[in-house]
Amino acid sequence: PLWAKATFPDPAGMVAKAHSLGLKAGWYMNNCQCRETRQTNATWVAAVYRQSVAMLADQKWDEVKLDGCSQFHDTSLWANLMEETGRPIAIENCNNEQPPAVGPNPDWADHDGQCPYNWYRTSLDILPSWPSIMNNFGSTVRYTQDLTHPRSKPGCWAYPDMLQVGNLATFEEDRAHFGAW
């Protein structure tokens, strides 16, 4: 993984500080700033997955956000590799670049039918407008409609992208958006 080493010289120390304050720490993996999409060497790609997971476990990160901007968005592989470390690392699936957003498959073969991530985004990027906010909220509905076998449930929650609190026109709009989220 890449990071601004001049700004963050000691990520493990930062994680330890967060833990000492009773907080959890998360890493934003394969973000859209680094488009690792042109690599075709399978050995190199597999090494990136393994080295990234080793870093997350060694530095004791608690959560990782997997964005859909690069070729490293195989959530089942990420989950399997993280499970092998013995350290619980929560996975946020943000594969939003594949509309409609990729939700959990009820037949995950590698995970005994269980969702390989802890929460997943159901919408495209949210904008600071009510139509965008309402569209994103609506994108979660299809994952909760089957009450017998919901695909949004404890351990595998659907969410409608980030909050736009502070970016809306009024305090009341911000509060309504926060409350609905």
Q: What role is predicted for each listed range?
A:
Residues P1-D74:
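Aromatic-lined carbohydrate-binding/catalytic grooves of carbohydrate-active enzymes
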Residues A79-N96, P100-W181:
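Active-site-proximal substrate-binding groove within the catalytic cores of carbohydrate-active enzymes
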